[in-house]
Amino acid sequence: MTRRYWNINLEEMMEAGVHFGHGTRKWNPKMAPYISAKRKGIHITNLTRTARFLSEACDLVFDAASRGKQFLIVGTKNKEADSVAWAAIRARCHYVNKKWLGGMLTNWSTTETRLHKFRDLRTEQKTGGLDRLPKRDAAMLKRQLSHLQTYLGGIKYMTGLPDIVIIVDQHEEYTALQECITLGIPTICLIDTNCDPDLADISIPANDDAISSIRLILNKLVFAICEGRSGYIRNP
C-alpha cells in the first residue's frame, strides 16, 4: 500500500479537541500506548499516534476506493447522526446513523428482503400507487415505509456486504463491530481512551464524543475516499 500525504495537522486536531479522552477512572489499560498525559482528571490522547493511524486509514480507503470497493459508515448517536450522513453522502458511501438492527450484516438475506420491500414501497409512493389503496391499507404501508426509511435509508442502494466498515464509536456500535469481525470485514474505528484498540483492523485514537473531533476524522477519510474514487472513474 502506497503511503500518501493527507495534510493531517496536529494543531488542527488540538483545536477540534481530538486529544481529549475520558476520565482517568474510566479507561481501558490497553489504551496506555496511545495516551500521552493526564490533565485535570482526564486522559490526553497522543496526537502523533492519532496522525499516524489516521494516515494509515486514509491510505487504506484511498486504495480501496480506487479499486471500486464499497464502504459503510456507522454512527448512531443522535449528535453525530447528521455528520455521519453528510460524510457518507459526500463520498457516496452507505451509512447507518439511527439504529443498528441486529443481524444487519450477519443475516444479510433478511436485510436484503427488507431492502427489496423498501424499494418496492418507494416506487409505489412515487407512482401514486399508495394513494389508490384504501385509507387504512395506505396508512399502514406509509408507516412501514417511514420505518424502513429511518433505519435502512442510508443503505438503500447496498446490494451486498460492504468491503470496509468505518465505525465512529466502538462502545455504541459494538454489535456492528462484532458482526464485521464475524464476517471478516475490515474495520476502521475511532477509539477513545475507554475502548479496546485490538478489535478493529485500524484503530484511530480520538475523542469520539466531540462533534468537532468526529467531523475532522470523517473529513479526512471522506477526502481520501473521494480522491480514490476519482482515480477509479478515470481508470475503470
Curated annotation (Swiss-Prot):
Q: Which domain of life is it from?
A: Eukaryota
Q: Which UniProt keywords apply?
A: Chloroplast, Plastid, Ribonucleoprotein, Ribosomal protein
Gene Ontology CC annotations of this record: chloroplast; small ribosomal subunit
State the Gene Ontology terms under molecular function: structural constituent of ribosome
Would the keyword Iron be found if you checked this record's keyword annotation? no
Q: Which family does it belong to?
A: Belongs to the universal ribosomal protein uS2 family.
SUPFAM superfamilies linked: Ribosomal protein S2
Q: Where in the cell is it found?
A: Plastid, Chloroplast
- Phylogenetic classification of the source organism: Eukaryota, Viridiplantae, Streptophyta, Embryophyta, Tracheophyta
Q: Which Pfam families does its entry note? A: Ribosomal_S2
Keyword field contains Plastid: yes
Instruction: Give the UniProt record's GO annotations in the biological process aspect.
Output: translation
Q: Which organism is it from?
A: Lactuca sativa
Name the chain's protein: Small ribosomal subunit protein uS2c
Q: Which cysteines are joined by disulfide bonds?
A: none
User: What NCBIfam families does the annotation carry?
Assistant: rpsB_bact (TIGR01011)
